[in-house]
Structure formats: structure tokens, C-alpha cells
Amino acid sequence: MEAWDVVVIGATVAGMRAAIAAHDEGASVVILSAHGLGNSGSDNYSSGLAASIDESNSMSHRDDTIRGGDWLNDQDIVSNRTTLINSHIAQLDQWGLNFRRSLSGSPGSEMGLGHKSPRVLTTGYSTSREIQHILEEQCIRREILRRGDWLALSLGSFRGQITGVVALDMIEGTVECLQSKAVIIADDGFENAWHSGNSSSRGLSISLDAGCQLRDLEFISWNPLCIPDTELSLTVDILQNGAKITTISGTQIETTPDMTPNKLAFEINKAGGTALLDATSIHKSAIEWYSGLRRAVKERTGLDMFEQSIPICPRIEQTIGGLPVDEHGRVVKGNWNTWFTGLYSAGGASCSGLNGTGIIAGNRLMEDLVGGSCAGMHAGKWIKNKNFSGTQSLNEALFSANAEISDMISNANTNNTSSISSIKSKLWNSITSNMGFERSSEGLQNAAKILEN
């Protein structure tokens, strides 16, 4: 049986930032990803990275975040995240991230949906992917082991304390047991319940099975700029660089400083659910930074977005709810004074209270970086005086996982096996129709009935 100080589930931005922080505290760390390495879904971020680097303090960023979340945020967490992000910007710059820059040479701040001051930093259209690559380089430099195509099956625990992870090595076809002092859940939320995508919610699933509770599941964040009938999603930052949105009839949809991505998505939905993105007048200084997006759109649709308008529609970007965590990323249990000992969470799988009802531009990456770093740092320090334990509980979890897989295989035959695509289609249709822009008690009950069947 392998033994690691910290096991990170999810090779996401948050997961790798957590692994780096834990490693720098002296912990032995392994990252498990259900996807292939380098394929963590970092392309579905709707904006760059928010930070108040050109302001004297982070008070305005804090206020905009609270306003964008309809005042349902955890205000202490908001202050914590908006204050700490500036040091992460300096670190990313030092590690080689190629920000768009101002005339002074420092990372340039742009306006963003939900912000009343310029504070969104980008590398063009692919900020999240570039940060993903930078963090991968830092993991390689530190010799942090990353394992792709490893599916977490269950958490091992004994008397309310984490003892390790049971996972399926999908390449070798074996079920393995990894003993650990701490586990960091850092994969994704459950946004793939609405549509196909590259996200994985295994962390939430196994945490629920282990007895954890989830928080704020009713709140979701929309990306208003997605291309219908494709998996392409565009960055809303292009709206600050000369692009405009019009309805099918030609009426322009104005974007104001008070408009968040969610509010813009609702406006498009009110206008019929589909609109047009006009990027033909994009600023000359931005053309090079968005040339990759232009190429991707043309390859998928045959349309040149710099020469003709392209159709767009809103789509779920991320679920806001998840595992309730404190400022250190510890998963709380029952009340804020008790935590599931040894279990941490960061990124899309967590719910710190930062966002309230919706995410303003750039705050998703901010939460991934700061939340991941806080979770990894605390875990790296916490495990120093802890011993490995719970070998028996892990062996029992391993036995149960093997038995469940064997039972599934033995009961599978052509007569009772449903089509995976058919099940997914029914799920997407039910969730989209009953838990989209409009919800009702009757619709939620109908969705629950369909899921039960």
C-alpha cells in the first residue's frame, strides 16, 4: 500500500496550486486526475483573473464581489481572497505567465463584468489555460507526481478522520489503495449535469458517501457567450475589447458596470435565448491576443468572428455550491467549529462563500489560486505532527470497491444495460428544463422524480 502525506484529487488549477503549496511545506504529494494529464477542463473559464493591483487596497473589489453575489457572500472570505490574490499575481509573473501589459510594463488591468474599476488581468482569450500550463511546469520542477486516468472511488476514514483514497487505475485496470494523512478534493462541481463537458464531480460524490454535507447547491454561474451546438465557450473579456452583443432583431444589449455574467445571460435569455456576438470592431491592440479564439471558432463553425457576427447562447459554466470550507480550505462538518479531520477542498468542488449567488468576472480563477494555496499550505503544515493510521478501514474500503465493481460486471448483459448516451440525454433535458433560468416547486419535484427513475 502506498503512503502519501497529501493526496490531491483533481489536476485542476486549484488542485495543482494546492499540491505546490503542500509540497513547499515539506509534504509528499500525489495528484490523481480522472482525465489524461493536461486535460483538466481549463478551457471553460469565462474570464481572466481579477485582482486590484492598480488600487490602493482591495475594498472596491470586495464590495463589487459582494454586490455581484447579491449580498449572500461570506464577507470575511471575500476580504481574505481579494487581499491575498495580489501576491499570487506577482508569483505568476515571476513564474513566466505572459500577461497583457500596460505601458509601464506591469500586468494590465481591464474592466470586467461586475466590476466598477479595471481589475481583470488576462493573457488574451486563454488565461486559465496559460495558468494551467505554468502550474504544470511548477509541478514538474518540484517533481510532484501526477497520475492521469485515475478515478477516485471512495475515501477511507476512521472515526471522522481521513485515512486515504481508493482509486481505479483506468490504464492498468486495477483498484489501488493510497494511504494519506490528508486529502484535498479539488476537481469540479456538478455542472456536467446540465450539458456535456470535461468536468468531473467524483470528489463531491465520494465526499457525500463519506458523510460530508454540501452547501449552496441552488446557485449556478452562467457563461453568456457560448456557441450553440458546440462545446465552445468564449471569454466575456472580449466585450471589454470592442465586441458587442445584439439580439437576433439587431437591438444592442448594453453591458454596464453593474452587469454580471449571470445578469447578461438572463438578458440574452429574455431576448429569446440566442443572440449575436459582433467582434468585427474589436480593438486593434486586442486582435493578436484573441487570434487563437478566432481560429478555434472558425475551425468549429466556419465563421470568421472578426468579419461576421456569430450566434451565442448562455450555458452553465460552474456550479457555485459544493463542500463547505473555511478560510484554510478545511471541510467543515455540522458547524463551523468542527471539520472532517484531514479533508480539504478547493476550486469548483468547494464552497467557501466567496461568490454568493453568482461569480463576477475573474473571481473564479482568483478563488482557484488563493483557495488552492490556502488548502495546500494548511494541509502541508497540519500533517507534520500526524501519523498514518486507519489501515484496516482502507482495506475494508478497497474490498468494498472491488466487490462493487465485480457485481456490476457480473450483472451486466445486453438485456439490462441502458445506453449511457440515452441516460445522459435524459439527465441533461430534465435538469436544463427544470433547473435553468426559471424554477418552480413543480419543476423541481418533476426533476427529482425523473432522477429517481
Where do the protein language model's features map onto the residues?
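Rossmann-like flavin
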Residues: G68-G108
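A glycine-rich dinucleotide-binding beta-alpha-beta segment and adjacent secondary-structure elements
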Residues: G148-D149, L153-L168, G292-S350
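Glycine-rich loop(s) and the adjacent beta-strand/alpha-helix scaffold that form part
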Residues: A182-L232, A361-H378
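An anion/pyrophosphate-binding glycine-rich loop and adjacent beta-alpha core
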Residues: I206, C212-I316, H378, K384
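N-terminal Rossmann-like FAD-binding beta1-loop-alpha1 element of flavoenzymes
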Residues: V6-I31
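Conserved redox-cofactor binding core of oxidoreductases
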Residues: Q94-T174, Q179-A182, A186, C226-T230, ...
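Conserved N-terminal glycine-rich FAD pyrophosphate-binding loop of Rossmann-like flavoproteins
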Residues: H35-D64, D70, S221, L225, ...
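Glycine- and aromatic-enriched mobile tails/lids
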Residues: M1-W4, A21, E25-A27, L37-G38, ...
